[in-house]
Amino acid sequence: MLARKAYRDLRAMGLRAVLIVAVIGAGPGTAAGISLALHDVEHTRDAFYSRYRLANLDLRLRRPLAAGPLLRRAQAAGAQRAETRLILDGAALYGGAQTSAEAVGMPVAAPLNRLAVTAGRGLARGAARGVVLDTDYADRFGIGVGDRLRLRLAGRTIALRVRGLARSPEYLLATANPDYLVPQRGSLAVAFLPRSSLQRLTGLRGRADDLAVDLPGGGQGPRARRLEAGLPTERVTPRSRQYGLRLTEADVHSFSIFAPVMGLVFGIVGLLLIALSLRRLVSSQRRELGALLAIGYPPRTVVASVLLPAAALGALGAALAAAVTIGVGRLVADEYSSAVGFPAVRYPLAVGPLALAAGLALAATLLAAALPAYRLARLDPIEALRGERVGSFELPGWLQRLTAVGPPALTYGLRGLLRRPLLSAATVVSIAGAIGLAAALNILVSSTNSAVDAEFAGQGWTHSADLARPLPDARAAALTRRAGAARAEATVKGPAELNAAGGGRTGIQLAGLPRRPALLRLDLTSGSGPAPGRIVLSAQTARRLGVSLGDHLSLRTSAGRTAVTAGGIARTLAGEQSYLPRRRASRLLGLPGRATTVLVAGDARVAGRLRADPAVARVTSKASALTAERELLDELTGLISVLQAISLGVGALFLVSTLALSYLDRRGEFATLAALGYGRRQIGAAVAGEALSQTLVAAALSIPLGVLIASPLSQRIAEAWFEIGLHPEPPSFLLVILPALALALLAAAHATRRALQLNIAATVRARLIG
């Protein structure tokens, strides 16, 4: 009996059942789809790193040393795998363009950091001048297999032929300036050569300046410190601080909040619409359920007779939610991977997000149906048999006067909203949530642009020159004078480790600044600049260690250990850097009176002279870093646009569903209006007035809601990447509100067309469900 009743109820619902299933599946499916996309991106990245053996620790030295002792040192430290490489900074010359380059001399059969060849062939011992190029650089300049290019290394120019293109786990998202967590795709020409070939071409036979290892327990801890001790280290990079890994972790950490936020927004409004729809269904069966109670059926049977059709709707909605999860997940994962230059995304079927989407859809449906059914089952059978009380639709006098502001059709539409406050409120909340979420994404993009522009605008340098080896301050100053720089500022940088009193530990890049830096200006959010015994931390490092101003820290470098106090916290895109006075930093790094980097203020000619100087390894410009940031944001805007389209699509579904449910409830009224002579224009005005009124109220509500949604998102971005603040601007909202109004008019036109197709006589006589 219950099964027959459920089947009959579903058939009677018709279009309403389809709309309820769509609403059930859309919200949870969209939220779970973003979770699935994050899972796919992480799985793709981790699978790539695992397959091509990304080392868990990399030591870059300031000068080449004999390779044999380095390998023996790694074995003594307990390394499971180890390889030495020769990595030289220089410039790639191709088609009149000069690009910062790293020549990587590596074993042909490398145990670590293997190459994933995407075109052509890999390295070969017999091809001494056959180079394998990083794919991003080759794509940027249109270089193909068989082309020729030149590398300028340590004053020598070497002619090479491109043997193949590849991606490396170490150089995934390679960038010329890794200080900033903004990838400049193609800005660094990574050229892979057989190690013996590069050693021979540069006169450094048997030498290496890079040691990559896999240590038990990862790349941090006592073994790593023992391996590093006494070496002239320029950079220490454990796997967790590898550039590509840090960037994707920051993105995944930032985007991971979208899933719960979208799930919360769509879940609330979806539950409202589901609850209202099923409440109408239960109320329409009041007499029928009362009869079951009167003839002796227990209340649990009455509740079951309602839950059974609801469960059928929920099961269909759960299946739709799973399908939406897969579709949204793959769409977002592909957009993200395209934006950051990842390899092709792999799609393992993650059960978690699918089960979450289906479970939420089914649970929301059953909960929405159980509450009105439970209330009805507690009624006295005689009271239930009397049917639903006829409510009065008469509005208070002041509301009647307020709504009588236009033609009768518009008045009818406005009063229709007020006569059904629950349905109208649910619609307004759902549309406001969809608009607010899309606007919040716009706010984040504009705020990020503003914050990064402000960060670079506050700096006085135009170019940064990394030196091939540390130079005395006087020689570094002479180098910039020869280049014709208007102003120059020498700095010293090197790897260090900070330990907090609470046990926190992190690797940093220690930078030494002049007493009054003119070119590198710190944007201090609290405290003061570097001073003896007082270190300035980036906001990211302070959060990672959980320290605040005045906290005591232990600073360890290859030259020793010292105690420092957190004297300032700076907002910076160079999240790995911490700052001390230059003299103190140079002593701690074992480089007293020397510089490793020179910041200059000058034009492109100055940069060209610096690039041509053999003492300079690499030159990067502030303008190129800013351009790269804008390009990245432009590409990520494509991902944001996908999320906005999804948000607006779900909002449009809610709007269309609400108008359709309202239309189904009021077919008799529309038929009566048509019988009284109302035509397309009058009925269309009534429906459009109702739809636009709801959308305009929702648009007004979406403004504070958008800021409210953007706030935790910006905080999450600050934790992972960079403190951007919030800069809400009118375009962020108008770009979403205007399409929402257009969608409202389209939905109203559809409802009007259906109203005009009604059979007037049959509709007026019919007994409608709900």
Name these PLM-found stretches.
Residues 1-4, 237, 395-411:
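Short, membrane-interfacial amphipathic segments enriched in basic
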Residues 50-66, 407-532, 536-540, 548-551, ...:
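Juxtamembrane segments of multi-pass membrane proteins
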Residues 14-40, 311, 319, 422-447:
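Short, strongly hydrophobic transmembrane alpha-helices
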Residues 490-491, 595-601, 609-715, 719-726, ...:
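C-terminal transmembrane helical bundles of large multi-pass transporters
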Residues 378-395, 756-770:
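Short cytosolic juxtamembrane segments of multi-pass membrane proteins
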Residues 2-268, 280-283, 299-300, 330, ...:
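Membrane transport/envelope proteins' first extracytoplasmic loop
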Residues 270-278, 285-287, 311-342, 352-378, ...:
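Small-residue-rich transmembrane alpha-helices
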Residues 13, 248, 272-312, 653-696:
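Interfacial "coupling" helices/loops that link adjacent transmembrane helices in transporter permeases
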